[in-house]
């Protein structure tokens, strides 16, 4: 069994190859050549010490959540990703979303590899969005607006610029200007972007009311909007940004890639935005429990599950044909991603093969 560290994953990965691998796995999904059971969510609790006699004995405190996500890509790979959400890890200098993938041999079932998968998770999510950009965005986009300044935001920018060299402006909005400044330096240093070719800008502070008008102005300019945050509330007002008085969507179509939320209480997009868009998802079951869909379907009753027009696998296979929405004349598409294990396993298998080719990783015989 091969142990592959996070640092080795970063050395081995090629963003273009990851996009190609993920596009192929969505094509296989369209041919029903994958198996992807629903994820299992396990709340991780610990017993709190009793502070006084009035408190209940054995009171439980939620530490975090673990998600178990198995999948099979027929004739290629099988495995499981275990990913957690542990907010207090930030205080310990650890990833708040730790992830590990176990790959098994498709002939014997034995474990082939254990792979640090935090970077893989970011890369496969960004690859899904990049694929949606390839098929659903305007042909020659010039401007991206990105909410967030994390690894997820970085990988989205890198992959989208890789596929769409026509892009000239990138606006990045985050609560921390310092984090955005660091991200911009990193983007320029790691990708050798010519300062004259791509203009990177910090745009206001997400969540700051005084900056709303500035954010809205640049959102109206954007051809692609990416939301990659942990926000509990919508990041912008759809009534203001998606107004036909402000923008001719037939002449300037809009693609929104929403990847940050996965729980019913969290959402980055409001119900107006969702209900007035052509909605594509990566995985129906996972997205149905994200706030973007759960709230307008189950709490507000303004749309139904049928508002989902297709999956990304339908897009890449040609089963889904892009259209203007039936509710308005706008040409607005939302690609909602909550993550699918077929991407995790396919991307991990790609890393495993490259590690073998490059003699990277630590071999351990656990069956000895």
UniProtKB/Swiss-Prot annotation:
The keyword Lyase applies. Disulfide bonds: none annotated. Its EC number is 4.3.1.-. GO terms for molecular function: lyase activity. It is an enzyme of class 4 (lyase). Keywords: Lyase. The keyword Lyase applies. GO terms for cellular component: cytoplasm. Belongs to the ornithine cyclodeaminase/mu-crystallin family. PANTHER family: KETIMINE REDUCTASE MU-CRYSTALLIN. This is Uncharacterized cyclodeaminase.
């Amino acid at each position: 069994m091969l142990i592959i560290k996070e640092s080795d994953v970063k050395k081995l990965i090629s963003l273009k190859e990851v996009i190609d691998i993920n596009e192929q796995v969505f094509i296989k999904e369209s041919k029903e050549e994958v198996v992807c059971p629903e994820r299992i969510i396990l709340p991780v609790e610990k017993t709190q010490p009793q502070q006084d006699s009035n408190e209940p004995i054995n009171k439980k405190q939620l530490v975090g959540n673990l998600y178990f996500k198995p999948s099979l890509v027929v004739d290629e790979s099988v495995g499981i990703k275990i990913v957690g959400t542990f907010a207090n890890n930030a205080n310990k200098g650890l990833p708040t979303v730790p992830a590990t993938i176990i790959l098994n041999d498709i002939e014997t079932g034995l474990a082939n590899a254990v792979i640090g998968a935090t970077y893989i998770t970011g890369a496969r999510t960004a690859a899904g969005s990049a694929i949606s950009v390839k098929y659903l965005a305007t042909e020659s986009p010039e401007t991206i607006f990105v909410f967030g300044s994390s690894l997820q935001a970085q990988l989205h920018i890198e992959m989208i610029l890789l596929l769409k060299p026509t892009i000239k402006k990138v606006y990045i909005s985050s609560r921390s200007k310092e984090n955005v400044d660091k991200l911009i330096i990193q983007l320029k240093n790691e990708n050798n972007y010519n300062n004259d070719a791509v203009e990177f800008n910090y745009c206001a502070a997400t969540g700051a009311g005084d900056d709303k008008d500035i954010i809205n102005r640049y959102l109206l300019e954007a051809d692609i909007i990416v939301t990659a945050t942990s926000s509990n509330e919508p990041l912008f007002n759809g009534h203001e940004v998606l107004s036909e008085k402000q923008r001719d969507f037939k002449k300037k179509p809009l693609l929104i890639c929403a990847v940050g939320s996965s729980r019913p209480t969290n959402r980055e997009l409001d119900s107006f935005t969702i209900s007035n868009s052509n909605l594509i998802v990566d995985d129906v079951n996972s997205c149905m429990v994200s706030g973007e869909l759960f709230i307008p379907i189950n709490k507000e009753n303004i749309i139904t599950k049928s508002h989902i027009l297709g999956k990304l696998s339908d897009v890449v296979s040609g089963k889904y044909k892009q259209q203007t929405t039936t509710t308005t004349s706008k040409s607005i598409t939302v690609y909602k991603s909550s993550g699918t294990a077929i991407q995790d396993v396919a991307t991990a298998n790609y890393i495993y093969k490259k590690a073998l080719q490059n003699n990277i990783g630590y071999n351990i015989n656990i069956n000895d």
